[in-house]
Every structure is written in structure tokens, then in C-alpha cells.
């Protein structure tokens, strides 16, 4: 009972407990203020009790404004005197609130510049891709790559391709005759450089430097690898031969074809290049049918048809 009186006195404006033991007291308007024991919160009032009706009407409320132009929740301004009394005559009509314009996050010019930059970047990518495709096609076909802007076309036509260099080096190493040039002295070389093919002096045009043949080492390595391959093939596929009996018997050569374990032996004849069995090889050489053809075939591992 004492706690109930204490809460009742704390919730009232006067802060005094009621004289009687009742939990509610009649107010000025005949209404009783009940004690609220919940932990509710009120704006501008006491804890545990709602504000009075007069205080609620006098309490200004916060008005929210909308960004949409057609909706406005602000109250219209009223005219009045300094003492709060209204004028006798009707006041002028309140002007409508100005339209609130909504703005975008980015201006239109920025979007246009951005789209323009994207278009330029895509165009540059397409141009670079087209150039790469042209360069790849020209390299695969063996034609010279077209010169870029600002480069001399005549200088590129004087440079031979890699295929031509390899072919010339192969012909030179094979023993093909090459035209010999007479040795020129330093004075003759300087005179030839000073005068052009038509006899006119040329000093401003730079002479292209001679290209060094860098394929000699590759050819040497290729020859060595080919020799190793031939020796390996001679070991795997030795030379065989068969000579028919009799004064007019002829000798037929071939090589033992590489075979796996469990497979039938095959001999390739040199004259026709046919794959034959040992019995067929003996018959092909003119020996006829023999009981053991492998005993009549001579194997010579020192010789090979590839050497």
C-alpha cells in the first residue's frame, strides 16, 4: 500500500501523495488519472503518466516534409497579433508552398562523357584486335607485315623472311655455286657508298645494315640431331639381305622394321618398300619356299639404308 501511494505521488504534477488510500483521484474535469505501472515513455511528460490534454494541445509537433512536389504536410501560416489574438477581418489566403524539385545523383553531362569514353575504349580495343589479327595472318602466310604509320616501306621490302634465309643457307651448305664478288678495297668501298646505283651522290639516305645469318648454329644443331636420329634408327631397324642360291642369284636388301614383343616380324624391302614377312621376303628375292626363312636372311647392323 505504501509503494502504491509513492508511485501515485511521483506520477502527479504536484508530486504529493493522495490523502486517502485510494489509488486514483478525480481530476479537475472529473476524470481520474490512473497510475501506469508499465515502462512506457511519453514525449514531454512524466515517467509513467501521459501528459494532460492541455499540455498535449500546447505541445508543438514536428511536421515532416515530402520530397514529392504534390505532397506537403507543412501547416499554412496564420496571421495574428503579438499577443496571440486573431484579427477581426479575414486574412489573406496563404500562398501555396513552392514545388520541391528532385535532383539526380549525377548530372546528364557526366553520363554523356562516360558513355563517350566507353565508346572510345571499345573502338581502341577493336582496332588493336584487328591489327593483331592482320599481323598473325601475314606471319602465317609468309608475306611481309604492312608498315605502321611513319615507317619506310622500302626498308622492310629489302629484309628477307626467315624462310628465305633458311633456304639460302641450306642451298649454300649443300654446295650450290654462289656468285663470287671481287674483294674491294677501303677506297672502292667508300666510293661505292658515296655514289648510288644511278651514279648520283647520296649522302642523306642511311644505308641499311647487313643482316647477320643466325641460322648456321641452328642448322648445325639440326644436323647433329638428325645424325643421332639416324644412328638410333639404324640400331632399332638394322639392314638385312638375302642372296638367292645359284650362279645367277641376285641379292635383295631390306631393313628389319621395328616391332613389339609378341608381334610378327616385318621386313621392308628397299626395291619396292613393301612390308613382308621373312618367308615372303625370301620368295620376293627369288629363293622360293624354305622351311626356316630367318636362317637364310643375313642381318648386318653396321650398314643401314638411312646412312
From Swiss-Prot:
UniProt-listed Pfam families: EAR (PF07897), NLS_NINJA_AFP (PF16136), TDBD (PF16135)
One Gene Ontology cellular component: nucleus
Region listing for Disordered, in residue ranges: 1-159, 173-208
Compartments reported by the entry: Nucleus
GO BP field: negative regulation of DNA-templated transcription; signal transduction
Species, as recorded: Zea mays (Maize)
Gly residues composition-biased segments: 8-30
Name of this protein: Ninja-family protein 5
Major localization class: nucleus
Amino acid at each position: 500500500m505504501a509503494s502504491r501511494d509513492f508511485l501515485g505521488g511521483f506520477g502527479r504534477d504536484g508530486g504529493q501523495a493522495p490523502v486517502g488510500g485510494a489509488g486514483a483521484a478525480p481530476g479537475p474535469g472529473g476524470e481520474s488519472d490512473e497510475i501506469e505501472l508499465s515502462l512506457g515513455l511519453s514525449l514531454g511528460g512524466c515517467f509513467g503518466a501521459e501528459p494532460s490534454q492541455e499540455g498535449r494541445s500546447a505541445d508543438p509537433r514536428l511536421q515532416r516534409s515530402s520530397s514529392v512536389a504534390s505532397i506537403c504536410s507543412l501547416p499554412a501560416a496564420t496571421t495574428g497579433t503579438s499577443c496571440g489574438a486573431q484579427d477581426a477581418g479575414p486574412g489573406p489566403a496563404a500562398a501555396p508552398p513552392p514545388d520541391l524539385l528532385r535532383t539526380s545523383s549525377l548530372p546528364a553531362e557526366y553520363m554523356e562523357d562516360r558513355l563517350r569514353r566507353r565508346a572510345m575504349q571499345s573502338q581502341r580495343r577493336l582496332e588493336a584486335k584487328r591489327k593483331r589479327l592482320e599481323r598473325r595472318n601475314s606471319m602465317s602466310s609468309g608475306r611481309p607485315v604492312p608498315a605502321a604509320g611513319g615507317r619506310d616501306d622500302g626498308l622492310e621490302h629489302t629484309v628477307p623472311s626467315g624462310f628465305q634465309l633458311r633456304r639460302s643457307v641450306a642451298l649454300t651448305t649443300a654446295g650450290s655455286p654462289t656468285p663470287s664478288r671481287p674483294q674491294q678495297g677501303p677506297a672502292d668501298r667508300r666510293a661505292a657508298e658515296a655514289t648510288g646505283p644511278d651514279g648520283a651522290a647520296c649522302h642523306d639516305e642511311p644505308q641499311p645494315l647487313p643482316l647477320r645469318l643466325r641460322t648456321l648454329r641452328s642448322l648445325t644443331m639440326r644436323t647433329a640431331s638428325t645424325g643421332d636420329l639416324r644412328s638410333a634408327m639404324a640400331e632399332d631397324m638394322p639392314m638385312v639381305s638375302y642372296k638367292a642360291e645359284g650362279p645367277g642369284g641376285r641379292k635383295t636388301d631390306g631393313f628389319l622394321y621395328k616391332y613389339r614383343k609378341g608381334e610378327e616380324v616385318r621386313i621392308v624391302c628397299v626395291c619396292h618398300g613393301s612390308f613382308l614377312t621373312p618367308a615372303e621376303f625370301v620368295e620376293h628375292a627369288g629363293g622360293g619356299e624354305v622351311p626356316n626363312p630367318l636362317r637364310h636372311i643375313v642381318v648386318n647392323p653396321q650398314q643401314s639404308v638411312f646412312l
